[in-house]
Amino acid sequence: VIPFVASVAAEMQHVYCAASRKC
């Protein structure tokens, strides 16, 4: 099983972190 959901969730979190600059 490919952890597609986990991969997408991690990418979305990274984008949100970069956009909000709350890293």
From Swiss-Prot:
Disulfide bonds join C17-C23. Keywords: Amphibian defense peptide, Antibiotic, Antimicrobial, Cytolysis, Disulfide bond, Hemolysis, Secreted. The keyword Repeat does not apply. InterPro entries: Antimicrobial_frog_1. The keyword Zinc does not apply. Expressed by the skin glands. It holds the Pfam family Antimicrobial_1. One of its GO terms (biological process) is killing of cells of another organism. Belongs to the frog skin active peptide (FSAP) family. Brevinin subfamily. Shows antibacterial activity against representative Gram-negative and Gram-positive bacterial species, and a very high hemolytic activity. This is Brevinin-1Eb. It comes from Pelophylax lessonae (Pool frog).
